[in-house]
Curated annotation (Swiss-Prot):
Tetramer of two alpha and two beta subunits. It is an enzyme of class 6 (ligase). Belongs to the class-II aminoacyl-tRNA synthetase family. Keywords: Aminoacyl-tRNA synthetase, ATP-binding, Cytoplasm, Ligase, Nucleotide-binding, Protein biosynthesis. This is Glycine--tRNA ligase beta subunit. NCBIfam families: glyS (TIGR00211). It is found in: Cytoplasm. The gene is glyS. Its EC number is 6.1.1.14. HAMAP family: Gly_tRNA_synth_beta. It catalyses: tRNA(Gly) + glycine + ATP = glycyl-tRNA(Gly) + AMP + diphosphate. The lineage of its organism: Bacteria, Pseudomonadati, Pseudomonadota, Gammaproteobacteria, Enterobacterales. It comes from the Bacteria. One of its GO terms (molecular function) is arginine-tRNA ligase activity.
Length: 689
């Protein structure tokens, strides 16, 4: 069977840079699925992506599908014919679907009966006949939120398409893809190399495109070149480039032929907070900032051109001219904002709505101020500093700098607070109030910042849930999932003595009569416990371990963490599986029983040695573990409880729980309930699988 290389390249207008990788990866995944569905053997599917093209190369693709034997079992003979031996409607319908008549069907005989059988040898189709359709299907399933039309055609795609190249070996695969007939023509760089040329065979790609068209189609190669050359460029000026992964990805998606260049700006701009300068360079211009070895911003930046120029200095000068006005704006805003104190912006917060039913940002500030003070008192932070941070928390939103450079919120509050002489932990709290912003982000670094961050997030959670605007599906406009996880991470990882019940109640209380949802406290807590579940699953804890702990509905996050870790450790013990099974058995027995249990086990009613032994063991453990439970030492408690295994096994082997004697039965059920209560001090281990 002949094997060849297949190439498809879709030549387009500039594709969305932030979506380029996902488009290419999805194209490859979709086409791979099509190959598998079509039963076309292949070697490897390799994707390529550049600003004006998506391409796939499939190695060792079979020229035809493999022949296959098809078998379709029909109705049983008893249902296939009536009493007179005539085919039933079911048999005729089945035969028609197979393209035969009933009398052409074979018989399948097994020890379970006899059925009609269709058997055929299906010859594999040529790959040439299948590939165009498979490409169309793969493209139609790309994750494109908004499609566009172009020209006078009804065809829709993420961007206008100009060329479609499909080659199997050296042969053009005929077909129409996205309204374009396939050919062997590909286009090169807009300004370098050959603007258009033909491919002789699929194996030439992408090397010939790089040599003749001055386009590096290999996404990872472009990214590696940019990273390598930017690091070298920074070293030449004694610095280190800020090569964040997200910006590297975006820049690699913007250029077909990366050329790394170094530029500079006036040193006077370094008086402006570095965050504002970096925001301009990275966010607006897609430049890489450069720092010295001490982490201070240098008056240089590295950028990537999409062309090899005979006069690179001209490109450098052009970029320096572009960025200078933006830096000058930042300098002006910074100087202007500092002409008044941060606190002077408070009245302007009354003009900005937080949410229609929940009031203005000034209303939110007042609530945050009170809640931050309350949280600070609970965790031993400076209450005065926490309330001060709460009062100033949203003031920087009214500054010129944050209005123009929105991503600098928080950090500009810190700089302005320092300028005003505020306490350092207050200033830092203003910067860190939004942390953690994403999974893996840093947590607030001091107790005042923790109090402010928790207060800000809990106020939003209480308010939005309080008016019934819960997150639905993928829609979460107020980022409540992120807020909930942020609160939990701060409490757990900082080991703060906070209870979600009282914390939520306090956040709700501060809204007064604004909230309409009477179940807001319970709903916020359930939502946060749900985020706990997702977080700990991501951390590698099993679902049933988390469920076992959640069954106790622990509302202190640090306590939840300790319980989950204790149960996870317990599962490594030899006795764990047997005790989990025993707890499940106990749970089922108690659930089915209609007897009213005693308050305590009556020693006088105990008859069997095994139940006496269990009762004695439970009394000893209960007294021993009371201070252990109180201290939250759940792992130690479960290790002690694991010693019950032998005693519990003996009990179930030799004692009839559901005795005919009412007093004996109720006493034994009470004994089992006391056993279960001990384990429930940690978790419901009957839920462990």
């Amino acid at each position: 069977m002949t094997q060849q290389t297949f190439l498809v390249e879709i030549g387009t207008e500039e594709l969305p840079p932030k979506a380029l990788r996902s488009l290419a990866e999805s194209f490859a995944a979709n086409f791979t699925a099509e190959l598998n569905n079509a039963n076309l053997p292949y070697g490897e599917v390799i994707w390529y992506a550049a600003p004006r093209r998506l391409a796939l190369k499939v190695t060792n693709l079979s020229a035809t599908q493999a022949d296959r034997e098809v078998e379709k079992r029909g109705p049983a003979i008893a249902q296939a014919f009536d009493a007179e031996g005539k085919p039933s409607k079911a048999a005729e319908g089945w035969a028609r679907g197979c393209g035969i008549t009933v009398d052409q069907a074979e018989r399948l005989v097994t020890d379970k009966g006899e059925w009609l059988l269709y058997r055929a040898h299906v010859k594999g189709q040529s790959a040439q006949l299948l590939l165009a359709g498979m490409v169309n299907t793969a493209l139609s399933k790309l994750p494109i939120p908004k499609l566009m039309r172009w020209g006078d055609k009804d065809t829709q795609f993420v961007r206008p398409v100009h060329t479609v190249t499909m080659l199997l070996g050296s042969e053009v695969i005929p077909g129409t893809v996205l309204g374009i007939d396939s050919d062997r023509i590909i286009r090169g760089h807009r300004f370098m190399g050959e603007p258009e040329f033909t491919l002789d065979n699929a194996d030439q790609y992408p090397q010939v495109l790089q040599e003749r068209g001055k386009v590096i189609a290999d996404y990872e190669l472009r990214k590696a070149i940019i990273k390598r050359d930017a690091e070298l460029a920074a070293q030449k000026i004694g610095g280190v480039a800020d090569l964040s992964e997200s910006l590297l990805e975006e820049v690699a998606s913007l250029v077909e032929w990366p050329v790394v260049l170094t530029a500079k700006f006036e040193e006077k701009f370094l008086a402006v907070p570095a965050e504002a300068l970096v925001y301009t360079m990275k966010g607006d211009q897609k430049y890489f900032p450069v720092y010295d070895t001490a982490g201070n911003l240098l008056p240089n930046f590295i950028f990537v051109a999409n062309i090899e120029s005979k006069d690179p200095q001209q490109i450098i000068s052009g970029n320096e001219k572009v960025v200078r006005p933006r830096l000058a704006d930042a300098e002006f805003f910074f100087k202007t904002d500092r002409k008044k104190r941060l606190e002077d912006n408070l009245p302007r917060l009354e003009t900005v709505l937080f949410q229609q039913q929940l009031g203005t940002l000034r209303d939110k500030t007042d609530r945050i101020q009170a809640l931050a003070g309350w949280v600070a008192a609970q965790i031993g932070a400076d209450v005065n500093h926490a309330t001060r941070a709460g009062l100033l928390s949203k003031c920087d939103l009214m500054t010129n700098m944050v209005f123009e450079f929105t991503d600098t919120q928080g950090v500009m509050g810190m700089h302005y607070a320092r300028h005003d002489g505020e306490a350092e932990d207050v200033a830092v709290a203003l910067n860190e109030q939004y942390q953690p912003r994403f999974a893996g982000d840093d947590l607030p670094s001091n107790p005042v910042a923790c109090a402010l961050a928790i207060a800000d997030k809990m106020d939003t959670l209480a308010g939005i849930f309080g008016i019934g605007q819960h997150p639905k599906g993928d829609k979460d406009p107020f980022a409540l999932r992120r807020a909930a996880l942020g609160v939990l991470r701060i409490i757990v990882e900082k080991n703060l003595p906070l209870d979600l019940q009282t914390l939520t109640e306090e956040a709700v209380r501060l809204y007064g009569s604004k909230l309409t949802n009477t179940k807001v406290v319970d709903e916020v807590i359930e939502f946060m416990l749900g985020r706990f579940r997702a977080w700990y699953q991501d951390e590698g804890h099993s679902v049933d371990t988390i469920q076992a702990v959640l069954a106790r509905r622990p509302t202190r996050p640090a306590d939840f963490d300790a319980r989950v870790k204790a149960v996870t450790y317990f599962r490594t013990l030899d006795a764990a599986a047997a005790l989990a099974a025993a707890n499940k058995r106990v749970s089922n027995i108690l659930a089915k029983s209609t007897d009213k249990l005693n308050d305590h086990v009556r020693a006088s009613v105990l008859k069997e040695p095994a139940e006496l032994k269990l009762a004695t063991h439970l009394v000893v453990l209960r007294d021993k573990l009371e201070p252990v439970f109180a201290a939250g030492q759940y792992q130690e408690a479960l290790v002690e409880l694991a010693a019950l295994r032998e005693t519990v096994d003996e009990f179930f082997e030799s004692v009839m729980v559901m005795d005919e004697d009412d007093a004996v039965r109720v006493n034994r059920l009470t004994l089992l309930s006391k056993l279960r209560e001990l384990f429930l001090q940690v978790a419901d281990i009957s839920l462990l699988q």
